[in-house]
């Protein structure tokens, strides 16, 4: 999940938070870590209850498990990192419908042990976090001349388009192209 099956650069999953929250490296890292928390926790729980869940209601049960951890995450973030919680806003509850989580629950956690599911969640979560942090860092640097909110270039440096929505598409496209080029080499 970190490199070969990176959810962002290879599988192209989770594009809504990828494009919407990566205006800075800190935001990308925050969203990635939040998603990783939910992914690990939901993978382990789904792996533990897989034999108790009838096939007919499997997907709704998985969504309830994921939503429960997202709700817990929201409360924790609101209490301990309110600035990041406010910045990420609507994208936190949207973790529930992130196809990475439901995909890993269905494809991996429902068929494997809790320990294997933990490591699957960790790997996919790290891959997602790394990708969002890199994309956020590229956009922040090109858009403002900063990285992790530390000025690296003069104040008048920056291309505004990279902190706006079109910049997300442009930067993501180039990063995917670089990953594809490196895979072929």
Where are these predicted regions, by residue range?
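C-terminal transmembrane helix-loop-helix hairpin of multi-pass membrane proteins
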Residues: 116-185
């Amino acid at each position: 999940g970190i490199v070969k099956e990176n959810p962002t650069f290879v599988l192209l999953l989770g594009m809504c938070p990828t494009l919407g929250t990566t205006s800075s490296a800190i935001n990308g890292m925050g969203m990635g870590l939040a998603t990783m928390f939910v992914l690990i926790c939901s993978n382990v729980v789904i792996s533990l209850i897989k034999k108790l869940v009838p096939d007919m209601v499997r997907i709704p049960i998985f969504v309830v498990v994921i939503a429960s951890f997202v709700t817990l995450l929201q409360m924790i973030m609101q209490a301990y990192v309110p600035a990041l919680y406010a910045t990420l806003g609507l994208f936190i509850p949207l973790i529930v419908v992130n196809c990475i989580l439901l995909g890993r629950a269905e494809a991996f956690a429902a068929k494997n042990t809790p320990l294997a599911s933990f490591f699957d969640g960790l790997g996919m979560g790290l891959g997602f976090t790394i990708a969002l942090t890199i994309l956020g860092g590229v956009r922040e640097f090109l858009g403002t001349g900063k990285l992790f909110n530390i000025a690296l270039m003069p104040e008048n440096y920056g291309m505004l388009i990279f902190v706006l929505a079109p910049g997300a598409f442009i930067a993501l496209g180039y990063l995917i192209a670089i990953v594809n080029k490196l895979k072929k080499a």
